[in-house]
């Protein structure tokens, strides 16, 4: 049980997918202008990353490895992610049309989010078992969502702040992301992974 807690904390804080591994930067910068959209995107990505990591583990261990075709991993994982994203898009469209409109083009773009493919491939490289794979996917998504919501809240504050003209827009956003990354580096010694 302690190992699973360390995996969760390590993935969310110490090895954060956005600020440490630099995966998922496109939605991090693109959807983080408002907290509502960042939260919605975070929830959708959490669902997709968790489900995709579970499906990827199942496909890898029960199809790719027994048939001795591990070279098809990337292609199979991309297909799995595309199917999971389409399922998520249908669910969000039916359950929350307002969120579906807010997320717009970014919902189908979860398919191309490198963090989703990254979690599936890293699960295989780390030789996680089924429970560890599910927890790793969920933890990576929680870390992604946490950083996106925090970044969106900071960007909302910066939108009304008196920022010097050369730093307005993307410049201050990148500086803020860098400072957040430095802040998360403070968690480095928290967990040995």
Curated annotation (Swiss-Prot):
Membrane topology classification: Multi-pass membrane protein
Entry-linked InterPro entries: Ion_transpt_RnfA/RsxA (IPR011293), NqrDE/RnfAE (IPR003667), NqrDE/RnfAE_oxidrdctase (IPR050133)
Keywords noted in UniProt: Cell inner membrane, Cell membrane, Electron transport, Membrane, Translocase, Transmembrane, Transmembrane helix, Transport
Gene Ontology CC entries for this record: plasma membrane
Location relative to the cell: Cell inner membrane
GO annotation (BP), single: electron transport chain
Positions of transmembrane segments: 5-25, 39-59, 62-82, 102-122, 134-154, 171-191
Entry EC number(s): 7.-.-.-
Tagged with keyword Lyase: no
EC category: translocase
Binding partners and assembly: The complex is composed of six subunits: RnfA, RnfB, RnfC, RnfD, RnfE and RnfG.
Family affiliation: Belongs to the NqrDE/RnfAE family.
HAMAP family: RsxA_RnfA
Function of the protein: Part of a membrane-bound complex that couples electron transfer with translocation of ions across the membrane.
Protein name, as recorded: Ion-translocating oxidoreductase complex subunit A
Species classification: Bacteria, Pseudomonadati, Pseudomonadota, Gammaproteobacteria, Enterobacterales
Recorded name of the encoding gene: rnfA
């Amino acid at each position: 049980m302690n190992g699973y807690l360390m995996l969760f904390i390590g993935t969310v804080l110490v090895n954060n997918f956005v600020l440490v591994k630099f995966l998922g930067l496109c939605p991090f910068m693109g959807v983080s202008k408002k907290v509502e959209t960042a939260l919605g995107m975070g929830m959708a990505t959490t669902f997709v990353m968790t489900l995709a990591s579970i499906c990827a583990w199942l496909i890898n261990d029960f199809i790719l490895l027994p048939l001795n075709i591990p070279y098809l991993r990337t292609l199979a994982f991309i297909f799995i992610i595309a199917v999971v994203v389409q399922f998520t898009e249908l669910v969000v469209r039916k359950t929350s049309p307002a969120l579906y409109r807010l997320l717009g083009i970014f919902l189908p773009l979860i398919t191309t989010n490198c963090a989703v493919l990254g979690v599936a491939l890293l699960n295989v490289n780390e030789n996680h078992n089924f429970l560890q794979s599910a927890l790793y996917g969920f933890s990576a998504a929680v870390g992604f969502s946490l950083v996106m919501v925090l970044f969106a809240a900071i960007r909302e504050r910066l939108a009304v702040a008196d920022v010097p003209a050369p730093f307005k827009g993307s410049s201050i956003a990148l500086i803020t992301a860098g400072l957040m990354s430095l802040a998360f580096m403070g968690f480095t010694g928290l967990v040995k992974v």
